[in-house]
Design a protein with these regions (language model features):
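Core catalytic lobe of class I
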Residues: 1-272
Length: 272
């Protein structure tokens, strides 16, 4: 039974069929597959091209959580050298698409993917979050689950914006947030961990009730990580990854980060 609005401006809703709306978009790939891949090596880091993760068994990963390079000319990006740095934004998106496609291949049925991105520029502004959403939803046909606004800081302090001050001539919005885009592979629910041994058993959840209520809000207030303390120009905080792990994985699940950066995901996995 669906719902519909009986007339404009009236809150009563009844008998609405939304299939026409959803039929306008590329359909996601829904699957009843509940076969989990064999577990590969754990607690290991591979150095290589994330577009080829053949060392990780297909269908073995419960959660991919990552923060791709920002395409902002950071030192860790340019240090990769000629031939390894995308020449332009379109090439950058192509690289992201290739890595995310390979990441999705490693996900088990119902496995989740959480991608942390910062939007780019002000003249003009570019929504990297929108482009990543298009990749996940339209190109890879994953099931989009939502978008979290990561609130890094509040108030008048923090980032600068070189626009007009106290004037409508050219005020510029200051970026105090990033996004975490969440999708799942083929189905909305998780497959029982026992499917690897032919037994239908659920895993052990680790998220406390109070944290679950906060984590299921679409705004997360988590302080940014110090680049100086971590020794990396653009680290994302361990607390952000820990929240993803608590919310989307069972104890003993396999987690993958194709852009390892400063090792935040590995630290969070060990902590939880």
């Amino acid at each position: 039974m669906g719902t519909s609005t009986s007339s404009f401006g009236v809150s009563k809703r009844e008998s609405h069929d939304s299939s026409d709306f959803y039929s306008r978009f590329a359909p996601p790939q829904i699957s009843d597959d509940d076969t989990l891949g064999e577990t590969g090596e754990i607690d290991v880091m591979y150095v290589g091209d994330a577009r080829d993760m053949s060392k990780v068994p297909d269908g073995s990963v419960a959660l991919v959580v990552t923060s791709p390079p920002y395409f902002a000319g950071k030192e860790y990006e340019t240090a990769l050298g000629e031939g390894h740095v995308p020449a332009d934004y379109i090439e950058y998106l192509t690289m992201l698409r290739d890595v995310l496609r390979e990441s999705a291949r490693k996900l088990e049925p119902g496995g989740r993917l959480a991608v942390n991105v910062a939007n780019l520029g002000r003249k003009p502004y570019r929504s990297l979050a929108a482009d990543v959403t298009t990749i996940l939803q339209d190109d890879l046909r994953l099931l989009l689950r939502g978008e979290v606004v990561w609130q890094k800081q509040r108030g008048a302090s923090g980032s600068c914006a070189w626009g007009s001050y106290q004037s409508p001539a050219n005020p510029v919005l200051r970026d105090t947030t990033e996004r975490v885009i969440i999708a799942s592979k083929g189905r909305f629910d998780r497959v029982g961990l026992g499917n690897r041994s032919g037994q239908s058993i659920e895993g052990t959840a680790t998220v406390p009730g109070d944290e679950f209520m906060e984590a299921t809000l679409d705004v997360w207030e988590i302080p940014a990580e110090s680049a100086t303390r971590v020794g990396h120009p653009a680290p994302f905080p361990v607390a952000l990854v820990e929240r993803c792990l608590h919310l989307f994985t069972y104890e003993g699940d396999i987690v993958l980060d194709p852009f390892m950066g400063s090792g935040t995901t590995a630290v969070a996995a060990k902590n939880t």
